């Protein structure tokens, strides 16, 4: 895409953007929705580490504060940097063309500087818990910014798998803030659940937005290999979630039943996609189910510790 075409896209995006407040623009810059959803997984890791180490949350309120604020700043920072990196392709996609780095509400230099500052500030807050929490935060940030955004996103269909590594780190940040050894198997089950969950989640989104990804030149799996192969991959990864609750027996039978029912429901919906003619409608259903799945699953992990 030449410079003139890019300018036309930018101008079109700007003129079609609704009026927004400075706060709304800031929330879009740091991708507040992503930060909020990942905060749940950070808190779950923190809470379960307390539970399995026989510790009280009231005795660790300071660590809870530093963990939530620190991880939130790290995630917000890497999202800012992602907006900075993707500012050339975001105008080409419907769901990203109103980002403040596209519309001009925030200049690229500000997004870069602000992202780096709050990222470093996040590491400082995490350092007030344990060095291992900082290391986990760094691994997540490096994977998302360098390995995903700068390297694989625009080159390989495996970009989804690489990006899922960074998205699986937040519960380990929370756990490491309490137990830096990360020696309990449930800590790594949280990582595996988050890693595997993201792949069918984002592949479903890629099917829904396949034309946008194609227009932006991003080699998502459905763009390169089509819907049938993508649906098979979604099913393979969804089935991989099925045995994981049985390695989390420490959370009790109630959680194992809830998690297994959620997994079976997702698998059944997935198989339905091979009979359904409207692939886009099915991908939306899979995407919505995945969001509800994650929320119910992680809230259940917390709730069962009270009984």
From Swiss-Prot:
Subunit-level organization: Interacts with CtaA.
Protein origin, superkingdom: Bacteria
Localization per Swiss-Prot or TrEMBL: Cell membrane
Protein name: Protoheme IX farnesyltransferase
Catalytic activity reported: heme b + (2E,6E)-farnesyl diphosphate + H2O = Fe(II)-heme o + diphosphate
Function of the protein: Converts heme B (protoheme IX) to heme O by substitution of the vinyl group on carbon 2 of heme B porphyrin ring with a hydroxyethyl farnesyl side group.
Any one annotated GO CC term: plasma membrane
GO biological process, one term: heme O biosynthetic process
Lineage: Bacteria, Bacillati, Bacillota, Bacilli, Bacillales
Pathway the protein contributes to: Porphyrin-containing compound metabolism; heme O biosynthesis; heme O from protoheme: step 1/1
Molecular function terms, GO-annotated: protoheme IX farnesyltransferase activity
Primary location: membrane
Pfam families according to UniProt: UbiA
Membrane topology: Multi-pass membrane protein
Enzyme class at the top of the EC tree: transferase
Enzyme nomenclature, EC number: 2.5.1.141
Keyword terms: Cell membrane, Heme biosynthesis, Membrane, Transferase, Transmembrane, Transmembrane helix
Family: Belongs to the UbiA prenyltransferase family. Protoheme IX farnesyltransferase subfamily.
Transmembrane segments: 32-52, 65-85, 108-128, 131-151, 158-178, 186-206, 251-271, 287-307
Name of the encoding gene: ctaB
Annotated InterPro entries: Protohaem_IX_farnesylTrfase, UbiA_prenyltransferase, UbiA_prenylTrfase_CS, UbiA_sf
Other facts: Carbon 2 of the heme B porphyrin ring is defined according to the Fischer nomenclature.
């Amino acid at each position: 895409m030449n410079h003139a075409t890019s300018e036309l896209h930018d101008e079109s995006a700007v003129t079609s953007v609704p009026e927004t407040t400075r706060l709304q623009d800031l929330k879009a810059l740091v991708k507040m929705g992503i930060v909020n959803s990942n905060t749940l997984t950070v808190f779950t890791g923190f809470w379960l580490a307390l539970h399995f180490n026989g510790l009280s949350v009231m005795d660790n309120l300071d660590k809870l504060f530093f963990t939530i604020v620190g991880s939130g700043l790290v995630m917000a920072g890497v999202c800012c940097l992602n907006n900075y990196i993707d500012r050339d392709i975001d105008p080409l996609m419907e769901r990203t063309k109103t980002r403040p780095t596209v519309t001009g509400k925030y200049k690229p230099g500000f997004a870069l500087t602000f992202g780096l500052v709050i990222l470093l500030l996040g590491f400082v807050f995490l350092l007030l818990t344990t060095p291992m929490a900082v290391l986990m935060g760094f691994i997540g940030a490096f994977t998302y910014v360098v390995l995903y955004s700068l390297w694989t996103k625009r080159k390989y269909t495996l970009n989804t798998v690489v990006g899922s590594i960074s998205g699986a780190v937040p519960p380990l940040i929370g756990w490491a803030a309490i137990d830096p050894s990360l020696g309990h198997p449930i800590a790594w089950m949280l990582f595996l659940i988050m890693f595997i969950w993201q792949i069918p989640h984002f592949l479903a989104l890629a099917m829904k937005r396949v034309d946008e990804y194609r227009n932006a030149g991003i080699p998502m799996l459905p763009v390169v290999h089509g819907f049938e192969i993508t649906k098979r991959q979604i099913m393979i990864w969804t089935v991989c979630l099925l045995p994981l609750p049985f390695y989390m027996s420490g959370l009790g039978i109630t959680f194992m039943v809830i998690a297994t029912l959620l997994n079976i429901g997702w698998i059944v919906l997935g198989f339905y996609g091979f009979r359904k003619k409207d692939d886009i409608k099915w991908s939306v259903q899979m995407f919505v189910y995945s969001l509800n799945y994650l929320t119910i699953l992680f809230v259940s992990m917390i709730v069962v510790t009270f009984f």
